[in-house]
Amino acid sequence: MQMNIGRCGPVCFSCSAPPSKSYTHRALIIAALADGQSEIIGQLDADDTRMTARALMQLGVRLDWSRENIRVQGTGGHLKAPVEEINIQDSGTSMRLLTGVSLLADGPVVLTGSGRMQERPLGPLIDTLNNAGAKITCLKNPGCPPVRIDGTFPAGDMYVDGSISSQFISSLLIAAPYADNDVHIHLTGDPVSLPYIMMTIDSMRAFGAEVLVDGDDKEPVFTISSQRRYKPQTYGIEGDFSSSSYWFALAAICGGSATISGLNPQSAQGDRRLLEILVNMGCSITEKRESIILSRDPDVLLKGIKVDMADCPDIVQTVCMVAAVSSSPTRITGVHHLRMKESDRIAAIANGLTTLGGRVETEEDVIVIHPAPLHGGIIHPENDHRTAMSFAVLGCFIGDVTILDAECVTKSYPGFWEELRRIWQNAVLC
């Protein structure tokens, strides 16, 4: 499927934030480990979250997924070894979070995925668990899926490299209450995406776990009590700042306003920082009780900024689209881990913007975007949902932009194209 995007003028629209993908993943897995039935309300129904649910069912978890909620019959931390390997396809979150959790099964578990998934790193997580006494074997390429997971979840001190993915730490955190004794997780390297770790801890505490945080942002230590295991809960999923970023960016790029409901202004989500970034680029923000409004006068030029985005990688592409129409250069640092996402996102940004006439410089950890006249073109997202959605938003400003393989957005936001079509059609009426 391809989507052809024409130019639209200033926008003026309201929409609801999709449910958080990150919180849905975490709630599903934690509820599956709790002792009793939990209800997850307002979940994200997308490819990735469905993949986590299917994997949990293969691990012996009973769940009932309806449009409004998911009822999960928890196992008390006693998972069943699956008869067949678990193929989580392209869901990196499922792969990483379930690697640690699979050590709670009563036998070996094999996790595999798509061709791209088999290139994505698991090494630091595997090394940490094996050094602590687990038995995890890579079945194809060193440090990558597919993996065979055996043994039990270890207690005591663990040291994990946090410079590649925060999901390695989240994987350890979520399973840790079911170790025989307390677990102490020490981060090494320069940790990235720390807010995602706090989202994990936030979810764990909501289900009754005890997690203590010591140290500082550079060398935090997390202590998880083995005496406070998960209890069943009724748990509501808050709105997703990552997916909402495209609508805020649309108003920033085209001018006008976007009113997004369902977002928590005090959320632990690191991608909430987008609002601060867009204000620094020339937009204004108004927070109301149940909505956040971003606006920009079309006569006021956007300006470039210098920003470190190590803690909010999922909105880097969104910010790059705004930078591409700004009046001065933008320099983004802290992005080295983007090369190991669903695609090499640094290359995707550079190639896509160059195709549309943009001027981009990249290094291992840096993206610099210069002002340049833009024109239409064809974008190949390489099955990366965030590439497709980001360039679609920019396409509304440029016009004559075609997004190939547009169905890839179902990974995180199945309703994206329908929502964009509605906003685009109404833009001329504002």
Curated annotation (Swiss-Prot):
Q: Which GO terms describe its cellular component?
A: cytoplasm
Which GO annotations describe the biological process of this protein?
Answer: amino acid biosynthetic process; aromatic amino acid family biosynthetic process; chorismate biosynthetic process
Note the InterPro entries from the entry.
Answer: Enolpyruvate_Tfrase_dom (IPR001986), Enolpyruvate_Tfrase_sf (IPR036968), EPSP_synthase (IPR006264), EPSP_synthase_CS (IPR023193), RNA3'P_cycl/enolpyr_Trfase_a/b (IPR013792)
Q: Indicate the residues that form the catalytic site.
A: 314 (proton acceptor)
Q: Where in the cell is it found?
A: Cytoplasm
Q: Which UniProt keywords apply?
A: Amino-acid biosynthesis, Aromatic amino acid biosynthesis, Cytoplasm, Transferase
**EC code:** 2.5.1.19
Under catalytic activity, the entry for this protein gives: 3-phosphoshikimate + phosphoenolpyruvate = 5-O-(1-carboxyvinyl)-3-phosphoshikimate + phosphate
Q: State if RNA-binding is listed as a keyword.
A: no
Q: Name one Pfam family in it.
A: EPSP_synthase
Q: Where does phosphoenolpyruvate bind?
A: 21, 92, 120, 167, 345, 386, 411
Q: Looking at the record's lineage, which domain of life comes first?
A: Archaea
Its pathway, per UniProt, is: Metabolic intermediate biosynthesis; chorismate biosynthesis
Query: Is Transferase a UniProt keyword of this protein?
Result: yes
Task: Name a GO molecular-function annotation.
Answer: 3-phosphoshikimate 1-carboxyvinyltransferase activity
- Residues binding 3-phosphoshikimate, per UniProt: 21-22, 26, 165-167, 193, 314, 341
According to its UniProt record, which protein family does this protein belong to? Belongs to the EPSP synthase family.
Question: How does this polypeptide assemble, per the annotation?
Answer: Monomer.
Quote the function comment for this protein. Answer: Catalyzes the transfer of the enolpyruvyl moiety of phosphoenolpyruvate (PEP) to the 5-hydroxyl of shikimate-3-phosphate (S3P) to produce enolpyruvyl shikimate-3-phosphate and inorganic phosphate.
HAMAP family in the record? EPSP_synth
The protein in question is named 3-phosphoshikimate 1-carboxyvinyltransferase
Q: Which organism is the protein's source?
A: Methanospirillum hungatei JF-1 (strain ATCC 27890 / DSM 864 / NBRC 100397 / JF-1)
Query: Could you tell me the gene encoding this protein?
Result: aroA
